[in-house]
Regions:
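Pre-Walker A (pre-P-loop) alpha-helix and adjacent loop at the N terminus of AAA/AAA+ ATPase modules
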Residues: 8-54
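Conserved alpha-helical scaffold flanking the Walker A/P-loop in AAA+ ATPase domains
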Residues: 34-38, 91-111, 140
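C-terminal engagement/docking regions of AAA+ P-loop ATPases
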Residues: 1-5, 9, 241-319
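Canonical AAA+ ATPase core
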Residues: 92-97, 118, 122, 130-221, ...
Length: 319
C-alpha cells in the first residue's frame, strides 16, 4: 500500500481545509477552487481567464494566503520590464563586487495579475522560471524555492490593451480555468457578507509549506495503469488527426494530463487514477494547448473539441 493509500484521510482533510478556506473568500466556485489547489499539488501553474470583477485575483490571493509560505503579487503593465520580475545585480562599492537583488519571482506562490497586459518580452521572462524553476541573471542560475507556483490572471484578448500569450507560454500552464459569473444565491451572499478584501485581511494559513511538499510527494506516487496511460495517448493522437485542429496535443500535454489526473485522484482519496479522473480534468488541461484551424479560434470551440475527443475515444474497460 502506498503512502497516499495509508493516509488518504489525512490528505483529504488537508485538501478540504485549503479548499474550504479559499471558499470563505470566493463564494460559489468550489470546482474552480479545487482545480487551483490541484494545480499546486501537481507542481503545475494556473491560468485564470475571465472578465474583470469575477474574483480571479481574490482566488489567487486566497490560495496564497491559505498556505504558510512566501508569496508575491506582480501587476503586469505595458511598461513592466523583465528585470522587474527576476531581479538585478547591484554593484556594491564598499566591497567592490556585485550582489544579486532577487525579484518577486523568488517566492513560493507568485500572482501574475493581468499577465496579458505586459509586453511579449516581459511575458517571456516567466518561461524559464515556470519550466525550469530557476532563473539566470548575468550568467548565474538561481534556484527558486519549492513549492513554486505561478498563478496568472488574464482578461479576454478582445479587451483593449491586451497581448495574446504565445503558445509556448500557454503550454507552461498545467490548467486554465474560468470562474464565470456567480449564481444568484452566491451573489446574494457576496452582497450580504464582507467584501473579499476584508476577508483576505483576516484569512489565516491552514497548511504549512512542509505539508504541501508532503502532499506533492503523495500525488507523485498515485498509480496510473498502462491501460489508462494508453487512453491518454489515444486522446492526444486523436487530436492530431482532427480536421478542425491545426496543431494537436504534444507529448508535454499528455504528461501534464497525467499529472492532473494524479492530483484529481489524490484529492478524492485514491492512490490510483481512473478514466473519470481524465474526463474531469481534460478540458482544463488540454483546451488551451490546441491550435485550431482558421475560423475556429473561440475558446468555447476548444473546450467543445476536447469534449468531442473524450466522446470519440474509447474508454478502457476494467478487467
Amino acid at each position: 500500500m502506498t503512502d497516499i493509500a495509508a493516509s488518504a484521510t489525512s490528505f483529504a482533510t488537508l485538501f478540504d481545509s485549503v479548499v474550504g478556506n479559499i471558499a470563505s473568500v470566493v463564494r460559489g466556485k468550489r470546482d474552480s477552487i479545487e482545480f487551483a489547489v490541484m494545480a499546486l499539488l501537481a507542481e503545475g501553474h494556473l491560468l485564470i481567464e475571465d472578465v474583470p470583477g469575477v474574483g480571479k485575483t481574490s482566488l489567487a490571493k486566497a490560495l496564497a494566503g491559505s498556505i504558510d509560505c512566501t508569496w508575491k503579487r506582480v501587476q503586469f503593465t505595458p511598461d513592466l520590464l523583465p528585470t522587474d520580475l527576476v531581479g538585478v545585480s547591484i554593484y556594491e562599492r564598499s566591497n567592490e563586487r556585485f550582489r544579486f537583488q532577487p525579484g518577486p519571482l523568488f517566492a513560493n506562490i507568485v500572482l501574475a495579475d493581468e499577465i496579458n497586459r505586459a509586453s511579449p518580452k516581459t511575458q517571456s521572462a516567466l518561461l524559464e522560471a515556470m519550466e525550469e524553476r530557476q532563473i539566470s541573471v548575468d550568467g548565474v542560475s538561481h534556484v527558486l524555492p519549492p513549492p513554486f507556483m505561478v498563478i496568472a490572471t488574464q482578461n479576454p484578448v478582445e479587451q483593449e490593451g491586451t497581448y495574446r500569450l504565445p503558445e509556448s507560454q500557454l503550454d507552461r500552464f498545467l490548467l486554465r480555468i474560468s470562474l464565470g459569473y456567480p449564481g444568484r444565491t452566491a451573489e446574494m451572499e457576496i452582497l450580504d457578507g464582507q467584501g473579499a478584501a476584508d476577508q483576505l485581511r483576516v484569512l489565516q494559513p491552514v497548511v504549512s509549506s512542509e505539508e504541501v511538499l508532503s502532499m506533492v510527494k503523495s500525488v507523485r506516487e498515485v498509480y496510473l495503469a498502462s491501460a489508462l496511460k494508453s487512453y491518454m495517448i489515444d486522446i492526444s493522437e486523436a487530436s492530431r488527426r482532427h480536421t478542425s485542429i491545426e496543431l494537436g496535443l504534444s507529448p508535454r500535454a499528455t504528461l501534464q494530463l497525467a499529472a492532473a489526473v494524479r492530483a484529481h485522484a489524490a484529492a478524492h482519496g485514491r492512490d490510483y487514477g481512473t478514466p473519470d479522473d481524465v474526463k474531469a480534468v481534460a478540458v482544463a488541461v488540454l483546451s488551451h494547448r490546441l491550435l485550431l484551424r482558421a475560423g475556429s479560434n473561440a475558446r468555447t470551440s476548444a473546450d467543445d473539441l476536447v469534449r468531442e475527443l473524450l466522446a470519440d475515444v474509447p474508454v478502457p474497460v476494467a478487467r
